[in-house]
Every structure is written in C-alpha cells, then in structure tokens.
C-alpha cells in the first residue's frame, strides 16, 4: 500500500551526489519536500531541478528542505548537475538521491512493486511536516 496523507514517512539512508543521506537526520525539525524524477538529463527534469534550486533560498527561510531522487547513479547526478547549473543559471546544491537499487522509490510508492525492473520512478512529490507526516 502506498503512503497516504497523515502517514509517517519511513526513514532511510541512501547514497547521493553529496554522500550518504539519512532522511530523518537530514530533515531534523524542518519541513521536507521529497520529490522524484524519472531520469537524469531529461529536459523537463532539468528545468524542474533548476527551478527548485532557484527557489530554495526562499524555502529555507520557511524552514523547508529539499531532496530529490531518481534511479540513476550518483556519478550520473554529478554530471547532470553541471548541465543544470549551466543551462538554468543556478546552483544545484541540495541532495539528489542515487536510488539505483530502487529501494527508496519502492518504499515510497514511486514505483509499483510489480513494475518492470527497467521502469524508472515516476514524478512524485511528498511534503512532510517536521513530525515526519505527509501533508
């Protein structure tokens, strides 16, 4: 069953381009926007991640942290971030989880458990309260 409004989000640790990330440790007492994207180097995802980077200072003023994921590797993320920064005139410095094993995507319902092993995560967004509940 997928996560629903009001559910406590499960904690996880996963690799990112910034090193290992533990969700609860990363979140602390902040709100968190966790969003997934299907794949690195896609035009729509490039503009979305660039826009999140541009808005991030405003979100931080409101105690909101951002984190994203895809089933690509941390090395792929690092290369793609250079493209995002160049084409979107911004600096992506928030974590992009490298969910190549699909563990977090499946845990959060971003990929159906019976989906093909080649299927990527769908675009999905969770806004989580400081209490770790989905709103």
Regions found by a protein language model. Give the residues of each.
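Single conserved hydrophobic/aromatic residue that forms the stacking wall/gate
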Residues: 126-135
